[in-house]
Amino acid sequence: MTASVVLLDTNVVLDLLLARKPFDKDAVAIASAVARGELVAYIAATSVTTIHYIARKAIGTLEADRAIGRLLLLFQVAPVTEHVLSTALARAFSDFEDAVLDAAAELVSVNALITRDAQGFTLSKLPVFTPAAFLRAMSAR
């Protein structure tokens, strides 16, 4: 079976990295599926800087640097190019960050977006799942 290819929203990666209860359980399960090769997951390049900024405030600069290093070993990075930004600007999303993630996801041809903010992606052409819903769909295959 071919592995699914997904893009993780920033909030899901922060749940994993900062062990944010009760959301961390699903984030850990998704990361474990990636580590086992059952899933390919991207994070957007812009998410990396946001994740570092928030993590640095919570766990300090050195630990945030180490955490980013681990994330880069586990996840692929979806580029945020001028084309991605222009595409995002042309979309009618209410949140520009969500539009950027959606356009980056399309650029790398993912099968789905995984987010805790599914309402932010109602205009996406891609299937959008919460982490829990994605895990249920994965286990049903």
Predicted features and spans:
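Short, well-structured N-terminal submotif of metal-dependent ribonuclease cores
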Residues: M1-I43, R56-R66, L123, F129-R141
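Alpha-helix capping/helix-boundary segments
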Residues: V12, S47, V84, V100-L101, ...
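Short, well-structured alpha-helical segments
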Residues: D65-G69, L85-S86
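Active-site neighborhoods of divalent-metal-dependent phosphate/nucleic-acid chemistry enzymes
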Residues: L73-A118
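Short acidic-hydrophobic, aromatic-tinged amphipathic segments that line or gate anion-handling sites
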Residues: A78-V80, V128-P131
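Short, structured coil segments at secondary-structure junctions
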Residues: S109, S124-K125
